[in-house]
Amino acid sequence: MTSQKGLRYDGSIDKYPITEGEIYSLGNGSKITIADITLGLPEFSKNADCVFIDPAGSKGVLKAYYTKAEKQCPVDNFDEFVAHIKRCIEQINPDRLFVECFYRNKKQLVPMVESLFPHVKIYENIYYHKPDCKCWIIQGTKQAEDWGLQGMDEWDAVFKICKDVPFSSITDFFMGQGLVAQAAYAAGKVFYGSDMNRNRLAVAISKVAKRGGEWTVTK
């Protein structure tokens, strides 16, 4: 059973008690809200011209995410989950897509990106700044591009993407605790974030606030 402390993460939800239907916004147009992609994307996410996502690596991990969000997992298998991801990307129709993946979900996510973009590049990366923690970033673009992400830690790669890639806005519909939000804010870029877990989103909101972001809340 997941502990109450685990469900609440660092307790940011007490300061930023985001609820269903609320939108947290910054002055530059960046927005965060609660959403489950199996039920649809927030409309503002469809305005992004760049996407970075780090989806669950397996059906078991996905089920655990729903448990932590105190919700029932609505998909029967991982392929069904990937189909929801693809549908969301098609609705956004971005110029560039970056998908972080791991050994367990790489075989499903690479073909998905290949079906959406004419140019696909796969970078080998690490996470937690540990060489033995391997991951990959799958890049889908309309033109051949190399953003120099090979070998980087995923944290540094996301900050590099937000700093160097010429997008107008970036969306992450698995926003979690807000790596993409922090990186985009640090680069002065607009971001759109959503996640089904309000406690995780509260951490993202808090981390951007600690970088100077001033949030307003609307319904």
Regions found by a protein language model. Give the residues of each.
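Class I S-adenosyl-L-methionine-dependent methyltransferase catalytic core
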Residues: 1-219
